[in-house]
From Swiss-Prot:
This is his operon leader peptide. InterPro entries: His_leader. The keyword Amino-acid biosynthesis applies. One of its GO terms (biological process) is L-histidine biosynthetic process. Keywords: Amino-acid biosynthesis, Histidine biosynthesis, Leader peptide. Belongs to the HisL family. The gene is hisL. It comes from Escherichia coli (strain K12).
Amino acid sequence: MTRVQFKHHHHHHHPD
């Protein structure tokens, strides 16, 4: 897993 993918894999809890 590259760093770019890791950055894109953020866990943001926000209501849809």
